[in-house]
Amino acid sequence: MINVPSIESCDFHNKNVLLRVDFNVPIKNGRICDATRILRALPTIQYLANAGAKVIVISHFGRPKAKDSNLSLKNVVETLSRLLSKEVKFIDDCIGERVQRAINAMDGGDIILLENLRFYKEEEQNDSNFAKQLASLADIYINDAFSCSHRAHASISRITEFLPSYAGFCLQDELKYLEQAISFDAKPITAIVGGAKISTKIKMLIKLAEKVDYLILGGAIANNFLLFNKVNIGKSFFQNGVDDLLHDIVETANKNNCKIVVPEDVLVAVNSDYSTGVLRKIESILDGDIILDIGPQTLSTISGIIASSKTLLWNGPIGVFEHSAFANGTVEVMRVVSDLTHEGKLTSVIGGGDSLSAINTAGLADKDFTYISTGGGAFLSWLSGDEMPGLRSTLD
C-alpha cells in the first residue's frame, strides 16, 4: 500500500489550513447538474472545521482564458453552504491582501472559499511565486483533489515545497480503491474501455492488456479495432494513423492471454438521424451508417463476461448515451455491474470518460458500485502507470 500522510495524525486547532479540492462541476443555466465532486470533499471539510481549523478551500473551475463570471466559484458557494449546513464565505480572489484580511478575521471552525485558481495563468504554469503566495495564507496544505493530481500545477504540485502536506479523505479513498483494483488479486478481471480517442488511452490499454483477462472495447475505440480487422464502419467516427498502436495492443493481449472483445452487432444512425437506432450485424454495416451503440447480442456477451468476473475496471461509455436511442448499451451494462456489485460477486471501480453522467442516465448512484473515481485524466494516468505530480509531491 502507498504510505499516505493522513490528516488524522495532525493537530489543526486554530491552524490556517489550505484545502485543495476539485469543484470543477458541470453547471447549466446557473444550476449544478452533478454535485458529486462537492459531496466527496465534505468529509474532509467537516473534519477540519470540527477540529478547529480555519478552513481555506481552493479549487479551479473550467478553463478560463481570463476572469469570467460564468467560471467563478461564487456559483458553487451556495450549494457548498447548503450541503455543509454551515455558512461558507466567498472571497473573489485567491491571493493578495484582501484574502489575507479575510483569513485574519476567521475563527477556528470557519470556512471560506477562494476564487477560481485558474483566473491566474500562473496556476497552470506551476509557477513558484504563485505557489508561494498561496502557501503564505496557511500553516498546512491538504490535497483532496485526486482528479487534478496528474497535473503539475502550482496548487497541486509546487505548493508542497512551501508547506507541510497531507492527503484528505477523498484522496485517500481514491488511492485505496484504485490500488486494490489494479493489484489484480481477484480474478478473472475485466476492463471496459470506451470513448472517442484511442491515442489518449494507448498506455492504459497496453497496461490493461498485460494484466486483465478480458478487455471490452466500446465507443469510437471499438470502431478503430473493427476497421483494423477490415470491417466496414460506414461513416462512424474513428481516429486516423493509429494502426501501429492497435497492433501493439493486440500483440500484448495475445502474449498475455487477454481476450479483446469488440461488438458483434451494433445500433447505427442512418443518414445522421440520431432519433432512431437501426440494428446491424457487424458484417452488414452500410456505407452511410454511423455506429453509436452496441446491439443485443453484444450486450449478452458482455453481460456474461462480467458475470464470470471478480473485478471490473470501467473507463468511458460504450455508446453515445447522450442520445436516448443509443443509451441502452451503456445503461444496461451499468445495471448488470450494479446488480453483481450489490450481490457481493463483483468489485467494480468506475472512472473517467463521462462515467458520472452515464451513471446518472442509468438512474444509479455511488452506492451501486464499489467505487466511482472522481478522476478523468487522473484515472487514466493512474491506470497507465504515469507519474502523478500531485501524488508524488504530497506523499513524498
UniProtKB/Swiss-Prot annotation:
Q: Name the catalysed reactions.
A: (2R)-3-phosphoglycerate + ATP = (2R)-3-phospho-glyceroyl phosphate + ADP
Cite the Gene3D superfamilies for this sequence.
Phosphoglycerate kinase, N-terminal domain
Q: Does the keyword Transcription apply?
A: no
Keywords attached to this Swiss-Prot or TrEMBL record, sorted alphabetically, are:
ATP-binding, Cytoplasm, Glycolysis, Kinase, Nucleotide-binding, Transferase
User: What Gene Ontology terms describe where this protein resides (cellular component)?
Assistant: cytosol
Please give a single GO biological process term from the UniProt record: gluconeogenesis
- Identify the residues that bind ATP: 201, 322, 352-355
Top class in the EC scheme: transferase
Q: What is its EC number?
A: 2.7.2.3
Q: Which PANTHER family match?
A: PHOSPHOGLYCERATE KINASE, PHOSPHOGLYCERATE KINASE 1, CHLOROPLASTIC-RELATED
Subunit comment for this entry?
Answer: Monomer.
Q: What is this protein called?
A: Phosphoglycerate kinase
Q: What is the lineage of its organism?
A: Bacteria, Pseudomonadati, Pseudomonadota, Alphaproteobacteria, Rickettsiales
